[in-house]
Swiss-Prot record:
Major place of residence: membrane
Originating organism: Shewanella baltica (strain OS195)
Lipid attachment, kind N-palmitoyl cysteine: C16
Name of protein: Flagellar L-ring protein
Gene Ontology MF annotations: cytoskeletal motor activity
Membrane topology, record value: Lipid-anchor
Record-level GO cellular component terms: bacterial-type flagellum basal body, distal rod, L ring; cell outer membrane
Subcellular location: Cell outer membrane; Bacterial flagellum basal body
Record's keyword annotation contains Lipoprotein: yes
Amino acid sequence: MARYLVLAVALLLAACSSTQKKPLADDPFYAPVYPEAPPTKIAATGSIYQDSQASSLYSDIRAHKVGDIITIVLKESTQAKKSAGNQIKKGSDMSLDPIFAGGSNVSIGGVPIDLRYKDSMNTKRESDADQSNSLDGSISANVMQVLNNGSLVIRGEKWISINNGDEFIRVTGLVRSQDIKPDNTIDSTRMANARIQYSGTGTFADAQKVGWLSQFFMSDWWPF
């Protein structure tokens, strides 16, 4: 019996444990893309000025091709609130008046037959959930792909090493070239299919995780 009990506890602990892999700083999915341009042949003219290395004072510095860098200004703010409630009432009432027969009450053992029954049930449940988050900052990302309509697929990450762990920001999404500002920045709210992840690894991050016992009480395995 004890063997089956230990096996059941082990299965519950395995079900409550998290299987999410820890993020890696060198994830190839977020590896930068470097533009591969063919070498430009520079003709020897004897002059210091070269047309191939010149740039116009009025040229557009905004990202527009694969390998370019763009800065995303994080301006994320979310707030969600949900409340629910229900109330169930149920009641029943039944009575049986004394029975008269022959001008007198029918009794059993001298006790008149008189039956009364009353039952009631009242169940009330309420739940509230309120959550708000905000994220401000900036991160530079690479242009990974240029679509036919001119939209840019961007992706990038930033890792910051602190005493007892690392913090990282990862971002990926789709932006329109028209939404990029002249200083080569774009607000995160202008990104489509945005995936923004801000988290950490190490001692501080592990301290914020919920323990296995608390996970069990909050999981579907808890019967109450």
